[in-house]
Amino acid sequence: MAKPTSKDSGLKEKFKILLGLGTPRPNPRSAEGKQTEFIITAEILRELSMECGLNNRIRMIGQICEVAKTKKFEEHAVEALWKAVADLLQPERPLEARHAVLALLKAIVQGQGERLGVLRALFFKVIKDYPSNEDLHERLEVFKALTDNGRHITYLEEELADFVLQWMDVGLSSEFLLVLVNLVKFNSCYLDEYIARMVQMICLLCVRTASSVDIEVSLQVLDAVVCYNCLPAESLPLFIVTLCRTINVKELCEPCWKLMRNLLGTHLGHSAIYNMCHLMEDRAYMEDAPLLRGAVFFVGMALWGAHRLYSLRNSPTSVLPSFYQAMACPNEVVSYEIVLSITRLIKKYRKELQVVAWDILLNIIERLLQQLQTLDSPELRTIVHDLLTTVEELCDQNEFHGSQERYFELVERCADQRPESSLLNLISYRAQSIHPAKDGWIQNLQALMERFFRSESRGAVRIKVLDVLSFVLLINRQFYEEELINSVVISQLSHIPEDKDHQVRKLATQLLVDLAEGCHTHHFNSLLDIIEKVMARSLSPPPELEERDVAAYSASLEDVKTAVLGLLVILQTKLYTLPASHATRVYEMLVSHIQLHYKHSYTLPIASSIRLQAFDFLLLLRADSLHRLGLPNKDGVVRFSPYCVCDYMEPERGSEKKTSGPLSPPTGPPGPAPAGPAVRLGSVPYSLLFRVLLQCLKQESDWKVLKLVLGRLPESLRYKVLIFTSPCSVDQLCSALCSMLSGPKTLERLRGAPEGFSRTDLHLAVVPVLTALISYHNYLDKTKQREMVYCLEQGLIHRCASQCVVALSICSVEMPDIIIKALPVLVVKLTHISATASMAVPLLEFLSTLARLPHLYRNFAAEQYASVFAISLPYTNPSKFNQYIVCLAHHVIAMWFIRCRLPFRKDFVPFITKGLRSNVLLSFDDTPEKDSFRARSTSLNERPKSLRIARPPKQGLNNSPPVKEFKESSAAEAFRCRSISVSEHVVRSRIQTSLTSASLGSADENSVAQADDSLKNLHLELTETCLDMMARYVFSNFTAVPKRSPVGEFLLAGGRTKTWLVGNKLVTVTTSVGTGTRSLLGLDSGELQSGPESSSSPGVHVRQTKEAPAKLESQAGQQVSRGARDRVRSMSGGHGLRVGALDVPASQFLGSATSPGPRTAPAAKPEKASAGTRVPVQEKTNLAAYVPLLTQGWAEILVRRPTGNTSWLMSLENPLSPFSSDINNMPLQELSNALMAAERFKEHRDTALYKSLSVPAASTAKPPPLPRSNTVASFSSLYQSSCQGQLHRSVSWADSAVVMEEGSPGEVPVLVEPPGLEDVEAALGMDRRTDAYSRSSSVSSQEEKSLHAEELVGRGIPIERVVSSEGGRPSVDLSFQPSQPLSKSSSSPELQTLQDILGDPGDKADVGRLSPEVKARSQSGTLDGESAAWSASGEDSRGQPEGPLPSSSPRSPSGLRPRGYTISDSAPSRRGKRVERDALKSRATASNAEKVPGINPSFVFLQLYHSPFFGDESNKPILLPNESQSFERSVQLLDQIPSYDTHKIAVLYVGEGQSNSELAILSNEHGSYRYTEFLTGLGRLIELKDCQPDKVYLGGLDVCGEDGQFTYCWHDDIMQAVFHIATLMPTKDVDKHRCDKKRHLGNDFVSIVYNDSGEDFKLGTIKGQFNFVHVIVTPLDYECNLVSLQCRKDMEGLVDTSVAKIVSDRNLPFVARQMALHANMASQVHHSRSNPTDIYPSKWIARLRHIKRLRQRICEEAAYSNPSLPLVHPPSHSKAPAQTPAEPTPGYEVGQRKRLISSVEDFTEFV
């Protein structure tokens, strides 16, 4: 065969020549001959012949070898050479020679191969038939050269196979095997017959050799056989065995697998699998581990390996048994390979495995587990358990199709080596079969517990078994509880207390607790025994325990906590189930355990946690009146146990309870205990817990626990049944609490307190408990009571001051004998508390409550009263406190001033006025002076001993002695300087905008300014009314509603009446006219009553207030006939009668404001009626027309002021002047007849007078008539001499009574007056008033005083004059001159007009109306009471702005008084015109008025009020026009406004099951006995039909029976309350929704709800727009009640709903009423927020505003009636500099004041 390379090169050369690219190839023959042919010469042959020596031959052979490799020999040269050297191959020849010849042959074959031809066979034969087996390598080299490394066997084919077999016997080397590989690959067909033998020999070589290289090459040969030939079947077993063994060589693993894979891919593949399986099963190979391992490997890899042969159809089922057989003899390697193989099978082809396969696999796993017991192979153990885990994962994924029972048996067999997760699965599987449907399930459970709980150490496994046990118990306990507890629980869990694993202990304990909770058999005690052992573990840490290990150690005690908490749950269940003894034992165990805590001083955090939760539960225990114990559910509703009581059972009560109701199931609702002798009540005495609580208070070191106990104790103490049914010592509790506050050790022992913890926090926690303990005062020792009050006093200096004040207020009610001793010091201590918003309401309500307990402060000295005022005054500051607090402060001041002892009051007036000035007035001022007054310190350091002199008094103003003058003027000055200068401060002030936001929650932005203004006015008016109140009560205790006695009615019947407006008071003077005597003489009194000053018109009767307290006392005796009753409904007390406009037609008041009686309202008088038509002229003069009647000389003075009315009845003691012209006109006969009649009447009159003067002033009577008169009868004093002595004695007796009450008969009191009061009015209340004004005429009109300089402070602005309507001519140009102000502190100045400009009131000229509202500056001054002269003040005083000035009002640009503003008295023309005009005006009515007998009221008024120079126009009294019905109505409406506040409170009764039903509550017609007792204490029962709605405030209740027959009302000095009681109102069938009741109850701001339902009453149950606050009264046992407040969310800032008071039945009505009244005051303030401009006023403020509006209207009327008067406009209420730039500075006013007035006033102008 030619060499391929030469062929290739030849082809390339030919291709190049063909394409013309290469040089033409020369003739090869010629080329060979010329270039490469080597000629074998004879010489060469000779050198090679035998003749030459061996060495020469060998040398030559070497040279020819070199040539033969490179050059071609000539033809037949090779044969020649071979012939020459052939002999050298003989065996006897030297080795070198043989090797040289073989090398020559190799060279010739390599170099001359193409030309050898048949010589190749020759050479092959030489090698094959070599005489010896030597020279193998060289011969092999020649063979490799001949066959081109086995590829070409030309001429060698026939003998090649024999040569190979021969050679394999003698020279089987790796070199030959490599040649053999090529022989098989390229010439396999020549080897077929001998291939089996070759394979056998190679296999043997593989087995026998140790050379990996030989084996690798042998594998290459075998691979070539398999791939290029056909492996004989008979060679297959050996072939497989060889590979199975060879595969164990690590380096040959890959080629072996490749060879096997090639084999398995042939037609022998299945046979090979079979052979390998046979090998695994053959017992002969059982010990041959490498062989079995290889077989397992090949089978596994071939059938389910990574490169499996899909051509093989063997299933795992067919080969796995062989695997199983291969494990017959334990061998680690084989087992390992089998595990790897089947793990690979399971992971890859788990879904294809059938049940049979899984069975075999489980058999294999089982045998593996058996082998693990004998084979100590960690690797095998690991991989086997991994296999089990793999199968387990398949089970979890539901992909295991074998027998789970079989598998879990295997797992259980090796459970000790299995991981926890596997055992958890095993236990879960086992638990599925533990149920009653399985035979022996309890035994199985017991076995499971024994195997995996008692014998197992791993916690997770044991916990899992406990879960199984718990589940089994949960499912089957209802029917098998007995067996399970007996056989399993007690036997398996009895050792739990000693168990080492705390987690297992904890869970086992929880299991026992859960089981015990529902266990009702005798086994319950067995379970509790185990739990008790768990609880007995010590909670003390070991001494060597470090801090960082505390948490870990605490965790080991969790089972104790579980046991205790479990007992709490058990107790909660056992309370309501039988037998009751179970609850008793649990309760005792709990208490005993907590006692251990304090006995051994457990301080670990877990111990504190146990105590915390135990107390948290135990302090929820409650008891009802039947002593049944109960616990609140999650909704807070307490359910009481029918089987457990809180005391040691008594047979009587026990039997009574047994028969009280039917048998109820344990889980049913609470009810009476079931009947029958088997039922036995359990005793759970609270005293056990109580003792532990005492230990806690004394020893507890954890603040959280102590705080919880203190926080829960107040509510527990409400249930007195708990305390009193077993021996609980409240004395010890009180001692423990007090020692906590007083002892220093409490804070030292506490730990766990928050940062910054102090004694204050301790007080905050303890004080509520002490407050709750007050209700036990009857069971406390007096010492303990005092100690408790002392602790509360100490708390006043801490943050808990508000709670302490509330507690002390309860003490005041419940423990008066204790508090009365501590109260003087306590009140002084209260002054040290800073005035803060949080303290305001508790403190003021405490003082308000205390004021109504006069027995507590009857021993108060001045210091205590001063302290009360010092406490209250700072809260009148409107810039710091809301409106409710300010109003409440004023209420407290008024109450305490009235209740203050009379001798002290005078000194407190400057004290209070100074406080009001500093807190109220300065709060509206921008000056720094505002903050310079500290109410508390100043109040106590400057106690009011006497009035101080503010300015030196001015001399020469009166005729009084110097000392008295000094006293009077200094009093006035001090009063003016300290308190009355309201105007002085306010005019300069600016309203702080913060006031509105502080007091008005919902103010509209547009009304903020108006609200500010109204709010400012409100606080100033509060101040005015306060000062007015003090002036009223400073020297007397008379009530605010006078009652005219029957004798007074007789004396004054038909008398003449005039009313003056003096400051902020209305002074009405009524004089007698003698109609009583006329009737005695047989004359008709109707003649006199038909005149112009008749009192028959209902519009002129003085009306009493609607709610007269005196009426409440005298109503039973008064049955007044009434006409048709009109229903009077009111939204809030008294507001229905508030006067908005004063010019309301009289017809609107006929229904409700007319006097009861037969009188009818006459038609309105015509405006221009003539005198003749009004008064019939008598044609004949008789006795009655001229004789002074017996009743003449009497006068009544009625003063109406904001805080009430005062009335005096006085007689004129002056005899009639002998120079009277009237006497001369009287016939002597008629005069004597009259005197005789007087003597006959004397005795009767004397008796009547004494009786009348002995009637108390507080009783009510028909109001006096108000006839008007403009003339003074000159004969009015004639009768005085006849009864002068009698009257003098009578009045003196009255005076002495007053003097004795005041206690100062010898001194002249000095009065400090409120705004708008003159000294003379105040003097009317003094002892000297009767002597000075009734019996004395020392001040006569003839005694002219010298004019003195007056300071002019008021200025007027002349406006366009109004032209008179009469005749159309302009009126005389008149102006008035401002004088000294009258009312120093009038905060709302109105225009005050002189009567001389008004002219005679009787003149009825038509006047025009001005459209703009006209106002004037109001100023004030003082009046000297002794001389009735108006003294100058000299203090800068300006009126408070009220509204913006009209822009059209001109002012004097020069700042001086404008011309025409005043007129000089020296101008005769003007003065003459005025006098002439006035005379002409008065002349028309004088003749008629003079005919009316009696003293003209002007005479009386002038004696009291006249001064030669009043000063300012505003100081002058203003006479109300008699003819104007609108002014009469205004006065009448003022009388309709009560002089004290009114409140209406709803009272509801909530019965059992009614807490959520409005209809049921409103349908109640009666309540419980305790409810009835409560109503009785609320007030006085009144019968509605006997009540006059205008006398008694009923809050809208009908008096005709529409709203029932009775109700309750209550009153004190300054307020009256009526109670709308739902159960006293009729329940009508037609009114199904109870609307008749709800129209009253739904409109009441505050409701007292007597909640007897046992459930919570929620706000909103009674639906109403105005139900702001509920006072909830919840009756408790032992005659106690819980009183709490509920309010709407928008009221939360005003009412403190956190306060709950425990009050006894005896004091409940008082406390509930007080809380309701305070809440109603707050509600009225809140209600006013909806309209910020309608600030809530008290009735006093309403009266004050009404009087001020009346003054303003009178001034406006004066301006209309006198067009020549320049109208005086007041400055605006807004900031003057900004809005009225033309207003002059104060400096101008000061200058004006220094100008003297050069005129003397004409007093007839205002009378």
From Swiss-Prot:
<feature type="modified residue" description="Phosphoserine">
    <location>
        <position position="1337"/>
    </location>
</feature>
<feature type="modified residue" description="Phosphoserine">
    <location>
        <position position="1799"/>
    </location>
</feature>
<comment type="subunit">
    <text>Component of the TSC-TBC complex (also named Rhebulator complex), composed of 2 molecules of TSC1, 2 molecules of TSC2 and 1 molecule of TBC1D7. Probably forms a complex composed of chaperones HSP90 and HSP70, co-chaperones STIP1/HOP, CDC37, PPP5C, PTGES3/p23, TSC1 and client protein TSC2. Probably forms a complex composed of chaperones HSP90 and HSP70, co-chaperones CDC37, PPP5C, TSC1 and client protein TSC2, CDK4, AKT, RAF1 and NR3C1; this complex does not contain co-chaperones STIP1/HOP and PTGES3/p23.</text>
</comment>
<dbReference type="GO" id="GO:0005737">
    <property type="term" value="C:cytoplasm"/>
</dbReference>
<feature type="modified residue" description="Phosphoserine; by AMPK">
    <location>
        <position position="1387"/>
    </location>
</feature>
<dbReference type="Pfam" id="PF02145">
    <property type="entry name" value="Rap_GAP"/>
</dbReference>
<feature type="compositionally biased region" description="Basic and acidic residues">
    <location>
        <begin position="1342"/>
        <end position="1352"/>
    </location>
</feature>
<feature type="modified residue" description="Phosphoserine; by RPS6KA1">
    <location>
        <position position="1798"/>
    </location>
</feature>
<feature type="compositionally biased region" description="Low complexity">
    <location>
        <begin position="1765"/>
        <end position="1774"/>
    </location>
</feature>
<keyword id="KW-0472">Membrane</keyword>
<dbReference type="GO" id="GO:0005829">
    <property type="term" value="C:cytosol"/>
</dbReference>
<dbReference type="InterPro" id="IPR011989">
    <property type="entry name" value="ARM-like"/>
</dbReference>
<feature type="modified residue" description="Phosphoserine; by PKB/AKT1">
    <location>
        <position position="939"/>
    </location>
</feature>
<feature type="compositionally biased region" description="Low complexity">
    <location>
        <begin position="1445"/>
        <end position="1460"/>
    </location>
</feature>
<comment type="function">
    <text>Catalytic component of the TSC-TBC complex, a multiprotein complex that acts as a negative regulator of the canonical mTORC1 complex, an evolutionarily conserved central nutrient sensor that stimulates anabolic reactions and macromolecule biosynthesis to promote cellular biomass generation and growth. Within the TSC-TBC complex, TSC2 acts as a GTPase-activating protein (GAP) for the small GTPase RHEB, a direct activator of the protein kinase activity of mTORC1.</text>
</comment>
<feature type="region of interest" description="Disordered">
    <location>
        <begin position="1331"/>
        <end position="1352"/>
    </location>
</feature>
<dbReference type="InterPro" id="IPR024584">
    <property type="entry name" value="Tuberin_N"/>
</dbReference>
<feature type="domain" description="Rap-GAP">
    <location>
        <begin position="1531"/>
        <end position="1758"/>
    </location>
</feature>
<feature type="region of interest" description="Disordered">
    <location>
        <begin position="930"/>
        <end position="964"/>
    </location>
</feature>
<keyword id="KW-0343">GTPase activation</keyword>
<feature type="modified residue" description="Phosphoserine">
    <location>
        <position position="1346"/>
    </location>
</feature>
<dbReference type="InterPro" id="IPR016024">
    <property type="entry name" value="ARM-type_fold"/>
</dbReference>
<dbReference type="GO" id="GO:0016020">
    <property type="term" value="C:membrane"/>
</dbReference>
<dbReference type="GO" id="GO:0043276">
    <property type="term" value="P:anoikis"/>
</dbReference>
<dbReference type="Pfam" id="PF03542">
    <property type="entry name" value="Tuberin"/>
</dbReference>
<dbReference type="GO" id="GO:0005765">
    <property type="term" value="C:lysosomal membrane"/>
</dbReference>
<dbReference type="GO" id="GO:0051726">
    <property type="term" value="P:regulation of cell cycle"/>
</dbReference>
<dbReference type="GO" id="GO:0019902">
    <property type="term" value="F:phosphatase binding"/>
</dbReference>
<dbReference type="GO" id="GO:0031267">
    <property type="term" value="F:small GTPase binding"/>
</dbReference>
<feature type="region of interest" description="Disordered">
    <location>
        <begin position="1150"/>
        <end position="1174"/>
    </location>
</feature>
<dbReference type="GO" id="GO:0008285">
    <property type="term" value="P:negative regulation of cell population proliferation"/>
</dbReference>
<dbReference type="GO" id="GO:0008104">
    <property type="term" value="P:protein localization"/>
</dbReference>
<dbReference type="GO" id="GO:0006897">
    <property type="term" value="P:endocytosis"/>
</dbReference>
<feature type="modified residue" description="Phosphoserine">
    <location>
        <position position="540"/>
    </location>
</feature>
<feature type="modified residue" description="Phosphoserine">
    <location>
        <position position="1130"/>
    </location>
</feature>
<dbReference type="GO" id="GO:1901525">
    <property type="term" value="P:negative regulation of mitophagy"/>
</dbReference>
<keyword id="KW-0043">Tumor suppressor</keyword>
<dbReference type="GO" id="GO:0046626">
    <property type="term" value="P:regulation of insulin receptor signaling pathway"/>
</dbReference>
<feature type="region of interest" description="Disordered">
    <location>
        <begin position="1083"/>
        <end position="1132"/>
    </location>
</feature>
<dbReference type="GO" id="GO:0005096">
    <property type="term" value="F:GTPase activator activity"/>
</dbReference>
<dbReference type="GO" id="GO:0016192">
    <property type="term" value="P:vesicle-mediated transport"/>
</dbReference>
<feature type="compositionally biased region" description="Basic and acidic residues">
    <location>
        <begin position="1401"/>
        <end position="1416"/>
    </location>
</feature>
